[in-house]
Amino acid sequence: MRKHTAITTFILLGLTEDPQLQVLLFMFLFITYMLSVTGKLTIIALTMLDPHLKTPMYFFLQNLSFLEISFTATCVPRFLYSISTGNKIITYNACVIQLFFADLFGVTEFFLLATMSYDRYVAICKPLHYMAIMSNKVCKTMVICCWMAALMIILPPLSLGFHLEFCDSNVINHFGCDALPILKIPCSDTSLIEQMVVASAVLTFIITLVCVVLSYTYIIRTILKFPSVQQKKKAFSTCSSHITVVSITYGSCIFIYIKPSAKEEVNINKGVSVLISSISPMLNSFIYTLRNEQVKQAFHDSLKKIAFRLKK
């Protein structure tokens, strides 16, 4: 995004001008943000410290938690600051940085979720070879590939964005620096970059969704062959948390990036963006902790150790 001499800052409109709604919105976002960060940090700490959680699945969960903390940190704190101070101005450079990291963390998360589905496929369909296939080196390589794939997808449209000119309007109808709202205000032609942004989003969505669907197709076929109901329940329970998180993530993003946005739907899209930025990460934390027996057991063991040390 090349800076025009007249534009060095942007104004973020946010979600509402109503003071009472802003107070409620601030409290809601602050609470959900703190719960999300606390939940993610708890998961990261448990997977690092508990020896029972030193498996590939929890290694990926640790990385997913880091990604979600990073993603929410790119936009929610800045929005909370804007609500509390009334300062809606963001500099050009800060906007570019926010856009880059939000896209990077968001796209990487999609690829990581696809990788986690492959991990579940190997664990259920090839249990005897699980630790050999999903070795520590392989897991680290797969995570690095997720980051590299995300970079390759976001850099082409972002590099084109540096050539955009902003003449008269610097008002972004959003609470953060998001690609589609930004592309509505340049005075130069944005048709090519808009197509690239949509193509990048669709490409990410389709590639990762195909991986997820294929993995779970084989998983379901394998589980249905298990002789006992108990075995089937146990196998499904190891996938339930991941399936729930995938459903929330993909379902919310379909609305914004796949469905065409009309002018009257802008406010709805902003609301969905808030859900993705704050509520989804918080829910994911509870899903992985409350529905996972090993994580719950590790959490209880950690509390017992802390209580025992405090009594000394």
UniProtKB/Swiss-Prot annotation:
Topological domains annotated Cytoplasmic: 45-55, 117-143, 219-239, 293-312
Transmembrane segments: 24-44, 56-76, 96-116, 144-164, 198-218, 240-260, 272-292
Cystines in this chain: 95-177
Main location: membrane
Keyword annotations of the record: Cell membrane, Disulfide bond, G-protein coupled receptor, Membrane, Olfaction, Receptor, Sensory transduction, Transducer, Transmembrane, Transmembrane helix
InterPro entries for the chain: GPCR_Rhodpsn, GPCR_Rhodpsn_7TM, Olfact_rcpt, Olfact_rcpt_6C-like
Residue ranges that the UniProt entry lists as topological domain Extracellular: 1-23, 77-95, 165-197, 261-271
Membrane topology: Multi-pass membrane protein
Molecular function (Gene Ontology), one example: G protein-coupled receptor activity
Compartments where found: Cell membrane
Domain of life: Eukaryota
GO cellular component: plasma membrane
Function: Odorant receptor.
Protein family: Belongs to the G-protein coupled receptor 1 family.
Protein's name according to its UniProt entry: Olfactory receptor 6C68
Gene that produces this protein: OR6C68
